[in-house]
A protein has these predicted regions:
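Internal gly/pro-rich beta-alpha loop/helix module
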Residues: 10-11
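Glycine-rich anion-binding loops and their surrounding alpha/beta cores
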Residues: 5-6, 16, 21-195
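Walker A/P-loop NTP-binding active-site region of P-loop NTPases
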Residues: 1
Length: 195
C-alpha cells in the first residue's frame, strides 16, 4: 500500500521490474504473480487465523532464479530465528535476518535492531550488528500516524531532504548495501542467470 501511495504500482511481470529498476526505483512483485500456488497457501492464514508454512517458504525463496540475491528474512520468535540460521548455514544462503513485526523485517527509526548476515552460508560479523539497547538519547521526528498514506508522505519528505533520515534507518540501509556489494564481489555473482 505504501508503494502504491508513492505512485509505484506493483510489477506484474519481469518487464515491469526492469523498467522500475531502470528508473532506479524499487519494484514490488506480488506473491500471486511470483508464484500463484504459494499465494493460495499463504491465503490459508485468513481461514486458519495463524501464519502457516507458506509464509516461511515465501521468505526463503530466491526471487531471481539462477542469480545471487540477498534475502531479507525476519522472525517473530527465537526458535524461528534458529531455524532460519540453520537453513542459511546448511544451504549456503545469502541472507540477512532481522526481528519482525507482523511478519515483516523491522525498520525501526528509533533504534537499531539486531541484524545477522550470511553470505554463502557463512555468518559475517562485519555485516552483522547487535541490537541497540538501553535508553534512547534522542528520538527522531516521526509522523503521528502509521497508515500507508502517512508513511508514504513521510518517505517522500525524507527522500526529498525535507526531513532527515533517522540514523538507525540509515545504518540499516548501509548494512544492506554493504551486504549486496560483498555479494556482487563473489565470482558466482558474475555468472549469467540460468534459463
Amino acid at each position: 500500500d505504501i508503494l502504491k501511495d508513492l505512485g509505484m504500482p506493483p510489477a506484474m511481470n519481469a518487464a515491469d521490474v526492469a523498467r522500475a529498476w531502470a528508473r532506479r526505483e524499487p519494484a514490488f512483485l506480488p506473491t500471486r504473480v511470483l508464484c500463484a500456488p504459494l499465494q493460495v497457501l499463504m491465503d490459508l492464514r485468513r481461514l486458519l487465523g495463524v501464519r502457516g508454512p507458506g509464509h516461511l517458504v515465501a521468505k526463503m525463496l530466491n526471487p531471481v532464479l539462477g542469480a545471487p540475491a540477498l534475502r531479507l528474512l525476519s522472525h517473530t520468535r527465537p526458535e524461528l530465528g534458529n531455524l532460519m540460521t540453520a537453513w542459511a548455514e546448511s544451504d549456503a544462503t545469502d541472507a540477512m535476518l532481522l526481528p519482525s513485526t507482523e511478519g515483516e523485517p523491522v525498520a525501526d527509526p528509533r533504534r537499531q535492531p539486531r541484524i545477522d548476515t550470511w553470505l554463502a552460508g557463512r555468518w559475517r560479523a562485519d555485516l552483522s550488528t547487535a541490537a541497540q539497547t538501553g535508553p534512547l538519547a534522542e528520538l527522531p521526528l516521526l509522523p503521528s500516524g502509521t497508515g500507508a498514506a502517512t508513511t508514504a508522505l513521510y518517505v517522500q519528505e525524507v527522500i526529498s531532504g525535507m526531513r532527515p533520515v533517522p540514523p538507525p534507518l540509515a545504518r540499516q540501509a548501509a548494512m544492506i548495501v554493504a551486504a549486496v556489494s560483498a555479494l556482487r564481489m563473489r565470482p558466482d555473482a558474475l555468472a549469467p542467470a540460468a534459463a
